[in-house]
Amino acid sequence: MTHGEELGSDVHQDSIVLTYLEGLLMHQAAGGSGTAVDKKSAGHNEEDQNFNISGSAFPTCQSNGPVLNTHTYQGSGMLHLKKARLLQSSEDWNAAKRKRLSDSIMNLNVKKEALLAGMVDSVPKGKQDSTLLASLLQSFSSRLQTVALSQQIRQSLKEQGYALSHDSLKVEKDLRCYGVASSHLKTLLKKSKVKDQKPDTNLPDVTKNLIRDRFAESPHHVGQSGTKVMSEPLSCAARLQAVASMVEKRASPATSPKPSVACSQLALLLSSEAHLQQYSREHALKTQNANQAASERLAAMARLQENGQKDVGSYQLPKGMSSHLNGQARTSSSKLMASKSSATVFQNPMGIIPSSPKNAGYKNSLERNNIKQAANNSLLLHLLKSQTIPKPMNGHSHSERGSIFEESSTPTTIDEYSDNNPSFTDDSSGDESSYSNCVPIDLSCKHRTEKSESDQPVSLDNFTQSLLNTWDPKVPDVDIKEDQDTSKNSKLNSHQKVTLLQLLLGHKNEENVEKNTSPQGVHNDVSKFNTQNYARTSVIESPSTNRTTPVSTPPLLTSSKAGSPINLSQHSLVIKWNSPPYVCSTQSEKLTNTASNHSMDLTKSKDPPGEKPAQNEGAQNSATFSASKLLQNLAQCGMQSSMSVEEQRPSKQLLTGNTDKPIGMIDRLNSPLLSNKTNAVEENKAFSSQPTGPEPGLSGSEIENLLERRTVLQLLLGNPNKGKSEKKEKTPLRDESTQEHSERALSEQILMVKIKSEPCDDLQIPNTNVHLSHDAKSAPFLGMAPAVQRSAPALPVSEDFKSEPVSPQDFSFSKNGLLSRLLRQNQDSYLADDSDRSHRNNEMALLESKNLCMVPKKRKLYTEPLENPFKKMKNNIVDAANNHSAPEVLYGSLLNQEELKFSRNDLEFKYPAGHGSASESEHRSWARESKSFNVLKQLLLSENCVRDLSPHRSNSVADSKKKGHKNNVTNSKPEFSISSLNGLMYSSTQPSSCMDNRTFSYPGVVKTPVSPTFPEHLGCAGSRPESGLLNGCSMPSEKGPIKWVITDAEKNEYEKDSPRLTKTNPILYYMLQKGGNSVTSRETQDKDIWREASSAESVSQVTAKEELLPTAETKASFFNLRSPYNSHMGNNASRPHSANGEVYGLLGSVLTIKKESE
């Protein structure tokens, strides 16, 4: 009767079976032996009685059915008493009840497929009832024949094994006893067929055989259907007769059912005992199988991996598997599909039969648990298949499928699998659904990592080639994906929780995997990233899944960083890499140094078609979308951002710009610990970035949008430390590549900050002396922006935001206005803090927080609300930046960098001027409080950034295109420099999104500093899509910094942006106001400050970047750690390098890369 309980949901579906069983169980439930009671109730209980009794007594019956007599009276009074005595006299009633349970289990088998698929009510009840009932009657008849022999054995087994193994046995017993019960029911059904036909219409239940057996009772039992499942199989035949008589004599059901009850009791006894015997045997088998299930699943996973690698059929099988798994996950949308999947599950030896319902709601979270469970068999099979799928995708089939799924299935994936939503459908990306399921399940990712490591680097080349071959077709698919991404917005809303669960589970697992990976070495890292990325590839193929299912949030970051840029890079391999030898060298470089990185890149390239366009479109749409929509699509946001970026990428600025930088980013992402290796790779990539340099900036910005969302998801997951460390690992890697661009961008961005046409050299000379000038200068990081410093002495903190304050289009720039003032007040104290930070980053981060809190009273009011969330983020960043000198902090800080990139993006958007001190201090606090940090706030902040970025990006992309590739490159470089600097501050993620936003916000300023030399590698990095935003005239200096004169329109845009951003982000606006500083005052101050901070905040941004320079210098020894400060160093050193050609400690490699890139 526990059987009935578990089956209760199914029985609820089987209203007839449940109704009749409820009637029997209602009488039976009190006595615990539901069979006798059920038969009695079926025999003499009226329909109403059955309803009443089943409602109350059914639970008891479920609990156990041995004590039938005591509660039989309760169930049906005197009739129940008679029945109870009848049943009591014959222990067969327990067996009969067990048989009924077996019948109901048989029904469950029918139902369970639906139930396993997460569709309890999925199957049409009325239609299937007759068919199921007929088959059930046949099986019951055969059971009835065999009951006599095994009656007593089954009774004993029933008492012993049935209750023990009702859950596992019910399926087996259902399967085994199905024939017996069907035969028994058939014979009984023939008797009660005339009566059964009446209820047949009433029976909507899945189990038609049982329905027929219960059909006489079905009309009233429909209401009870949920309760009587357990005992129903027992009395199915008897009930059919008794219920038929009851249905006929509903007014007086007790009269007719009594003979029926006697007959049905005997029949149910026989069938139930046969059922019990079979069920006990099956239970024993199932208990054994349950133990074997895990190993079997693991073996099946391996087999599926191998088969998936070998066969495309694996795709289809995982397709079905993932389909039913997804159906389980999305019980609402794919119940029918779930029914199919449950059949698939049953087909699978490891079928998820027990845990299918679990997977339904929390499939992603449960998947990892279920992998350990027998229910995970199908999941693991599916995951293995999807793992194998990535392998074929790695290989030739990976090229084919990667291209196909990227082009055709990725949009579907975005719709169905990327969301992991109930909106999952068996589409072209059904295998990608398996990917999605796989990727959320970190075990599958890890399995891929372990099993696919060897395969993926080799197939990576094939995949790269296939991606290169299919990249352009994918770009149109990117648009499709964007449309689907929009459709996903609604889908993601329902599945967002699963995504968060996936993030929590997958992010932690992938964090562990990535953490394990990065220490292992570049190749191991690469291998793991290959496997993860192929796991992600499946997910990434529907980029929104990777983004939406940040379960593999680190993979998301990987795909965000590497994927977005590498998508661009792959696309740019086709488009931008004009020289095949260069492409070959870059690809070989990737494949050697980042063999798996390249696979990651390609994987991400695969998914960025949806991912980048999603990002750019998400960025562009985020302006359109409300804050709530962004929150809804946050899981999507990485997908949307990547999609959006990819949309821009088809504009080929992204395609050209992102190729090399994503590679560097991916290399860095893959081997954050292997900074020397990665640095060499980065240098190679920096050199290779020269041709494709412009793209990485945009790619970086897109990546940072993705990382932003990933950070938000990580924050939502509450594993900010792991995510941050991973993110920061990746971020410094990306920051290094970003630094390559950011170096130029820094000089450029310094010019950008120097909207006052302050030459980049001036800014960069101070930037070179940043740590030196930090102590001396009132704006410690204003060393880069001494001229800007005059306007925003406190804005050196915003050195990262140099370009950002230039353009109030950036929301963070509006915040930067507040932060600019705050930092202007704070900068004198913060300058010392910056110098100290270079010496004692943690200490100074605290000081920065204090300075932010103490020095700027006026600005603090505005900055502090931002700081409330952003202080946390900034403190996180500061902690990560200050602590990432420690290798362990490196990972944490890398993850924090990702997170902080997110938060820094938000922070930068909020108050880029206070970026260096306020942002870092706040990030420190935020890192500490990131888990408790309001996810909504961060989401809104990230949305705010994205929104700002999206319109600006679109405009600047168009303008960048208009302004020409070099200017675009130059413009994007400042953006990427800002993003790099911000990434240095916020980890490299921010440069893309925040810098893009800032650059977009003040493209004229930001892009003005960009030097034509930087356009090569930085060209499209962040600014290209946004360079169009610059309304100011660009006066490109051949030396490299392009002086941008911000026009009044741009300033108006700045002013517009802050209120627009706040208004576009009502939730963010509210949260900011709620955070302690009114957004209104922020907006007004932002408007004022934007006018001031157009130049003044440029200085502030420069200051922030300069602040990072000391930290970068301080962390120079840790550059190999690829800590956020490594990226900071890379970016800061890059900036001084472009300005002075100096190398700051470990920044030398990055600087060298940037020099060569330049």
From Swiss-Prot:
Regions of biased composition (Basic and acidic residues) lie at 37-47, 601-610, 723-745
Residues forming the motif LXXLL motif 8 are 819-823
Give the residue ranges for region: Repression domain 2: 410-700
Region (Interaction with ZNF366) spans which residues?
1-415, 753-1158
Q: Report residue spans for region: Repression domain 1.
A: 78-333
Task: Indicate which residues form the motif LXXLL motif 2.
Answer: 133-137
Where N6-acetyllysine occurs, residue numbers? K111, K158, K286, K310, K446, K481, K528, K606, K931
For region Repression domain 4, the annotated ranges are: 1118-1158
Motif segment (LXXLL motif 1): 21-25
Query: Per the Swiss-Prot or TrEMBL record, what residue ranges does the short sequence motif LXXLL motif 4 cover?
Result: 266-270
In chain numbering, motif LXXLL motif 9 lies across 936-940
Locate the cross-link: Glycyl lysine isopeptide (Lys-Gly) (interchain with G-Cter in SUMO2).
K111, K170, K195, K198, K372, K508, K756, K802, K850, K901, K931, K1105, K1115, K1154
Q: Where is this motif: LXXLL motif 6?
A: 500-504
Q: What induces it?
A: Expressed in a circadian manner in the liver (at protein level).
What are the record keywords, sorted? Acetylation, Activator, Biological rhythms, Isopeptide bond, Nucleus, Phosphoprotein, Repeat, Transcription, Transcription regulation, Ubl conjugation
Q: What does this protein do?
A: Modulates transcriptional activation by steroid receptors such as NR3C1, NR3C2 and ESR1. Also modulates transcriptional repression by nuclear hormone receptors. Positive regulator of the circadian clock gene expression: stimulates transcription of BMAL1, CLOCK and CRY1 by acting as a coactivator for RORA and RORC. Involved in the regulation of ovarian function. Plays a role in renal development.
Which disease? Congenital anomalies of kidney and urinary tract 3: A disorder encompassing a broad spectrum of renal and urinary tract malformations that include renal agenesis, kidney hypodysplasia, multicystic kidney dysplasia, duplex collecting system, posterior urethral valves and ureter abnormalities. Congenital anomalies of kidney and urinary tract are the commonest cause of chronic kidney disease in children. CAKUT3 inheritance is autosomal dominant.
Per the record, the domain comment is: Contains 9 Leu-Xaa-Xaa-Leu-Leu (LXXLL) motifs, which have different affinities for nuclear receptors. The C-terminal LTKTNPILYYMLQK motif is required for ligand-dependent interaction with RAAR and RXRB homodimers and heterodimers, for the corepressor activity, and for the formation of an HDAC3 complex with RARA/RXRB. Contains at least four autonomous repression domains (RD1-4). RD1 functions via a histone deacetylase (HDAC)-independent mechanism, whereas RD2, RD3 and RD4 can function by HDAC-dependent or independent mechanisms, depending on cell type. RD2 is dependent on CTBP binding.
This protein's assembly is summarised as: Interacts with RARA and RXRB homodimers and RARA/RXRB heterodimers in the presence of ligand. Interacts with HDAC1 and HDAC3 via its N-terminal domain. Interacts with NR2C1 (sumoylated form and via the ligand-binding domain); the interaction results in promoting the repressor activity of NR2C1. Interacts with CTBP1, CTBP2, ESR1, HDAC1, HDAC2, HDAC5, HDAC6, NR2C2, NR3C1, NR3C2, YWHAH, JUN and FOS. Found in a complex with both NR3C1 and YWHAH. Interacts with ZNF366. Interacts with RORA.
- Identify this protein by name: Nuclear receptor-interacting protein 1
Source organism per UniProt: Homo sapiens (Human)
Q: Gene name on record?
A: NRIP1
